[in-house]
Every structure is written in C-alpha cells, then in structure tokens.
Amino acid sequence: MLVLKTTDKEFSPRFQSLVSDRREATVDVSGTVRDILAHVKARGDAAVQEYTSRFDHYRPHSHHLSAAFIAEQAAKCSDEVKAALELAAERISSFHQKQLPQDIGYTDTAGVKLGLNWVALSQVGIYVPGGRASYPSSVLMNALPAKIAGVERIVMTVPMPHGEINPAVLAAAQVAGVTEIYSIGGAQAVGALAYGTETITPVDKIVGPGNAYVAEAKRQVFGTVGIDSIAGPSEILVVADRQNNPEWIAWDLLSQAEHDPSAQSILITDSESFAQQVIAAVEQILTTLPSQKVASSSWQNHGAVIIVRDLAESIPLLNQLAPEHVELCVDNPQLLASQIKCAGSLFLGRYTPEAIGDYLGGPNHVLPTSRSARFASGLSVYDFLKRITYLECNQAALQKIGQSAVTLAETEGLPAHAGSVAVRLQGLKDM
C-alpha cells in the first residue's frame, strides 16, 4: 500500500507511477482466445459443448435453459432476496427510463427537411460471469437498459460450473425480462453470441463483464458485433476530510478491494492523522473479513493513500486518475463534483457509500475502468440505441443548395457525385 504526500519532493514521479499502474492480466491470452473463437465459428454447438465440458466440467444435452428450470431455480430465492431484486429493478428502470431521447426533425431556411431517429438494436447478448463474480445485480444493470431501449431479443449466457448456478442470477433475469438464457461461459460464449451456432442465433451487440479470456474475446469479435467496453479491475477513489468516521471510509475502500486482487482503492484526504486512522481501520477489518485474501492482496499491492494540502488539490489528481467510482465524503460535495471531468460515477456526501450504486441507487454500475473515464461513460440506454439521420429535398430546396454540392464534388475529383446532382438540376431547368 502506497502513502503519498503532495508536499514531498518525490511526489510527482511517484504519483505518475500510480497513474500508470497497469493492473490488467499480464498473461497473453490472445492466441488461446483466437483458437476458441475459430473453433466455435467453424463447428458451432459441438465446439461449445467441448469447451464447456473441459472448462466447466458440465455437459448438458442442451445449453438452452428452459422456462421451467429457470422458474424452479428462481423459486429457491428467499422472499427477502426477491423483494430486493424487485426494488433494485424498479429504481434502475426509473433512472434509465428518463434517459430515453427524443427524435429530431425540422425544416431549414433552404426548405430541406432534416432529422434524426433513434432506433433500438434488434438483439443483444449479455455475458454474466460465474464463479466469484456471479452477480445478479449485473444482470439487472445490463438487461434493464436494453429492455427500456426497446431491444426485442435479450440473450444471456452464464456458465454453470459442475452444473450449478446462483439462483438469484436467474431470478434477476426473470425480473429484467431476459428472453433467452444459455449455460455457456468464457470465450466460447462470446463466440456463440457473435457468430451463432446451430441453436443460438447471433446477436448485434455483446455487453457484460468477464475474465481476461472474455475481455479478449470481446476485443476480437468487435466489428462482427458491437461491444460495450473492455472491463478492467474495479476502482474506487474516496475524497474524505477529517470529519468522517474512519471505519466507514475503510469499509468503502475494501468494498472494491474485495472484488479482485487487481482492484484499486485510493483515499485522498487533507488530514494525515485521519489517513492513519483509516489505514488502521482497514487493517483491523481485514483480520475478520471473509474476503480477506482477495481484499488484502488488492490493498497491499494496489491501494494508495494521498495526503493533500487542501481538498481543492485533490481535483487535478482525481482527474488524472480518472477512476471508476468516486466518493466525495465532504461537507460540500457538489462544489468538488462540479470540477470533476474524468470519473465513471460520483457518490456525494457521507451517507452515499458506493455499494448503494452497485445494487439499487439507479445509475448503472457498469462503468469505465483503467482510466478510460477520460473518454468513456457508463452503460446506459444509449448503448442499445442507434441514430439514423435523414434528409429530404424538394425541387426548390435542391435548386438552392445543389450547385454548391456540384462544386465541392468537382473539387474532390468525384465526377459521379457531381453528376448525380447536376443531372437533377438540369432536369429542373428543362421542365
């Protein structure tokens, strides 16, 4: 765990080292993934069966999960879990419903009609991890925006190691309106969604997090299908003053550290004594935390505490780090928030732990990582929509603007472009 002070002479190079810390998997899996995708593309269901048997020790007669099986598994969830999923779905849906954009249409001064129509994607694939990262909340966060956007076919793949699955994942799929579910994981699932098999119709876009193999598979199929992003390890940055309870902040830091040994948790504070209290609280919590092994590895190898002269000094540091999650645990969080340009999502005030956003705050928890918040945004309804523009010229409008189009086409040396306009202009003169 790194401790930095902006007053130290060596702060700048040490901070830049933190900014450039590459926490993604260092093993090159591109060749393995390329082979898996090629086999799935060429051999379809047979290849999917072989990889599922090899990696998940599971060989079903069909990977398609029936409505009866889904209902049977979902029924295993307690009433409390079902109610929590319903509440989360309600809040997520409400926020994303408000994102739906309006079509644009107008007639300009030349008499040309112009516009833009929003159109939903036809079919989308959602990858849901198994194992440690089997999260029903991710089902809601990926599927609900697609449903609200108007996607008609929402296909989910989820691995079932040894034939087992988290019932809450299937309950969440029911709540979110997923239309098809297949028990496939890994790069082979991405291949099946992208290329299709004898039993799986290919989709137009693939969203959802996964391990290094899934991330690389999404990278390789991009172009054949759309993708949301290449997800990296989780991140949280907490800006906190001395008025906070250090134990609260420690729990917040560990909430992301427990995701992955490569996750990163950073505290920025203007109080050195408070920083030491938080560090001590983290160490104390780790002694009894069930996820101690993962969280401790993350904290020790990638955690950081930065002590600044004042909280205003945190803003340029934060914008350079461009973290996935930012908590502003200060008296006037809106003041700092207005200056933040690079972050996935903000959590304002002392009573808004990031975990609320993970489950049922409303905004999406699929957020840019690995400093991609410099240029990317979290998952939203817009990820499941396309924009189609249109133009309509009548005779008078073409006569007003057409000759300029001919001039530009001739300037670019494209005579057929020029001719397609000029022939119409001549036709209008001859009328």
Swiss-Prot record:
Residues involved in substrate binding: S234, Q256, H259, H325, D358, E412, H417
Positions of Zn(2+) binding: Q256, H259, D358, H417
Enzyme nomenclature, EC number: 1.1.1.23
Known catalytic reactions: L-histidinol + 2 NAD(+) + H2O = L-histidine + 2 NADH + 3 H(+)
Cofactor note: Binds 1 zinc ion per subunit.
One Gene Ontology CC term in the entry: cytosol
GO BP of this protein: L-histidine biosynthetic process
Keyword GTP-binding: no
Top EC group: oxidoreductase
One Pfam match: Histidinol_dh
Annotated active site: E324 (proton acceptor), H325 (proton acceptor)
Pathway: Amino-acid biosynthesis; L-histidine biosynthesis; L-histidine from 5-phospho-alpha-D-ribose 1-diphosphate: step 9/9
Keywords: Amino-acid biosynthesis, Histidine biosynthesis, Metal-binding, NAD, Oxidoreductase, Zinc
CDD domains referenced in this protein's UniProt entry, alphabetically: Histidinol_dh
InterPro entries reported for this sequence: Ald_DH/histidinol_DH, Histidinol_DH_CS, Histidinol_DH_monofunct, Hstdl_DH
Cofactor: Zn(2+)
Family statement: Belongs to the histidinol dehydrogenase family.
UniProt-listed PANTHER family: HISTIDINE BIOSYNTHESIS TRIFUNCTIONAL PROTEIN, HISTIDINOL DEHYDROGENASE HDH
Protein's recorded name: Histidinol dehydrogenase 1
UniProt organism field: Nostoc sp. (strain PCC 7120 / SAG 25.82 / UTEX 2576)
Lineage: Bacteria, Bacillati, Cyanobacteriota, Cyanophyceae, Nostocales
